[in-house]
Amino acid sequence: MCLCGTFGLGLALWGSCTSSGGKTETVMSDSVDAEQGNVVVEAIMSRRSIRKYKDQPVEREKLETIVNCGINAPSGMNRQPWQVRVVDNADYINGITEVFKKANPKAAEEPGFKNMFRNAPAVIFIASPKDGSGQLDCGLLGENMVLAAQSLGLGTCCLGGPIAFMTGNQEAASYLERLQLPEDYALLYAIGVGYPDESPAAKPRDAEKVKFVE
């Protein structure tokens, strides 16, 4: 089931607490017994950042579902201040990766390195207006997409490093141009998408940062 138009927090579903250095941390439970059967909560609580992917392409239909869920995110006054570009073209991904390797030769020496997008076979680029407006809305867009991907059995990882490289390296300019962004838009971040080849454990979440005000 796709989670179109969904943005939420599973604050009530944390598990046991651990203490480290006098600071109480709350660890998310792998189960969601309190909301068993709620597909939205389950997707939120089970989603992890994936950095290892299977050598398997993502079906175009699933990518279309993901971006459709993304553009159904809320935005201020429904301005929809985003530009979204989906790349599942291996020639593009491998080409920009070669430029990256030329500038960062040690990167190719890392075990299992295939491409600069954490080896994801598909990448979704998100751009926002250069004047700085719309970044919050683009964040909501991205959250919808990563949750939709999770519900479709896909893994994701939000990426900032490749964007810094693409916008700062002159040899990468041709790949940036191929995205055909409006002149008043700039890349904000990217999302790697693919079939996960790892199952990371949940990391601690600090419940002390959440307070109900009476």
Residue locations for each model-derived region?
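Acidic, surface-exposed loops and disordered segments
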Residues: 1-214
